[in-house]
Amino acid sequence: MKKLVVLVSLCLVFGCYQTQRNCSDYKTGTFYSEVSINNVVYKSTFKRTNNMQVEMYDGKTDSTHVRWINDCEVIYKTIHPKNMAEQKDIHLKIIMTTDSSYTFEYSYVGDTKKQKGIAYKLD
């Protein structure tokens, strides 16, 4: 009986905890992003509207079409791809939000290897 009480208590505590995801707050705006790949941190700033995103990184500008699947998932398609990698669409999923940032995971569409990053809303 004692084990049952402990088990039920744990289920109630962990069952009530849910990761905050107010994804619609991050559909549009200006953002700063950091992604770590192979221990190298890549930084960029980007402005996203309902249907387009313009990103600046390493002195380059990249533009993509934006297609929201739901409030927390989006597909990016590069407007003028310069190579085979840029021709692949990217799937991004917001996995957690705070009042000023969101944590995300992303991969090429159909790829199982995912990367994670964080974006901070600037406006």
Where do the model's predicted regions map?
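Positively charged n-region of N-terminal signal peptides that target proteins for export
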Residues: 1-4
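C-terminal motif of bacterial Sec signal peptides marking the signal peptidase cleavage site
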Residues: 12-15
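Bacterial signal peptide processing site
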Residues: 17-19
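Tryptophan-anchored aromatic micro-motifs
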Residues: 23-39
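N-terminal glycine/threonine-rich, aromatic-flanked beta-hairpin/loop signature
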Residues: 41-69
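Short, exposed beta-strand-loop hairpins at the edges of beta-sheets
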Residues: 55, 94, 103-115
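A short, structured loop/turn motif at beta-sheet edges
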Residues: 65-73, 94-101, 121-123
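An anionic, turn-rich surface loop/hairpin at beta-sheet edges
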Residues: 76-99
